[in-house]
Amino acid sequence: MKKVLLYIFIFICTLFFNIWVYADTTLELKEPVIVFDKIAHYGLQGYTVAKDKLFVVLEGYDDTKSIIKVFDLNTYKEILSYEYGSLGHANDVTYNSKNNKIYVIASSGSDKVFIFNGDTFKYEKTIRIGLPVRSITYIEDYDRYAVRLIGTGYLYKNDFTLVSKFPFIVGMNLSSEVGRQGWTYYKGLIYYANWSWVSQGGTGTNALFIYDLDGNKYTSIYTDESIGEIEGVDFYNNKMILGFNGYDKKIKFYVSDIPSVEKETKNQEIIKKEAVIVKKKNYEVYIIIGIVSILVIIILVIILRHKKKVIK
């Protein structure tokens, strides 16, 4: 009987520990470093870090106009803002540090990419790359681009010819409830921002799904879901920059430490999903597990005592 109770105790402790550990992978974001009121009929879409500047695209709701904003990442002050014509949905933006160009993708089924100067932040030209990409990131280590369609990703050379006609990643989040946002390469991994689309039946959860360049899923990092819809992720000075369309009608950018990333097993991925539920429901799962565990122990004790009496 003592052994049975010991095993039960170890099981419960392990379960609680795993839930506690993985619930803590939700980033606790502090005050935003950049915040401004939404401009009528415009919302945050893509953005990128260009040297020490943050290049931001606000997309008009009818896709016919856009606003470009540029912020100094050392002071977080706005240094440029101007209205521009259509950049499509402008779902993602990336910066090529080798040619000093900024690339804005039209998205929404288009293969157009708009190129801006990395010093003046002014439009230069439009190119077509052959695929209707929805996310883009420049991979400085290999002088390539990684692009995402819906659930697949391809690699382009620096002249926007395909490295291979086969995708390097397949089967990414295909749920209709998921709002797929921008992605960014950082130190060997791609960080892919997603939002659980409320109007499509989602929960409003914000997440970063992390992959390597072989298409292997590493882990998931969850962010504060009360802020608003996450639009992308980028990096500066070994910190993560997260941008949101806030539920309070403000556009916000947060700076966060980068969590350590290790490749997760399937079991860990399941535990993480449960951990998100725990956080979302104010730890109701803790209470339920506790009650069930206590009931199991009581029932086992009663059964064992009854058997002992029968033997006597």
Task: Please state what every model-predicted region is.
Residues 173-213:
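Loop/turn-rich, solvent-exposed surfaces of beta-rich toroidal or solenoidal domains
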Residues 40-49, 86-95, 129-141, 175-184, ...:
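Repeated scaffold domains used in trafficking and secretory/extracellular systems
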Residues 28-39, 77-83, 122-128, 162-174, ...:
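A short beta-strand motif characteristic of beta-propeller blades
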Residues 63-69, 110-115, 151-159, 199-209, ...:
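Structural motif
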Residues 231-271:
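Blade-level signature of beta-propeller repeat domains, shared across WD40, Kelch, NHL, RCC1
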Residues 76-102, 106:
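Blade-loop segments of beta-propeller domains
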Residues 297-312:
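C-terminal membrane-anchoring or membrane-association module
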Residues 72-76, 116-121, 158-161, 212-216, ...:
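Short loop/turn segments that connect beta-strands within beta-propeller blades
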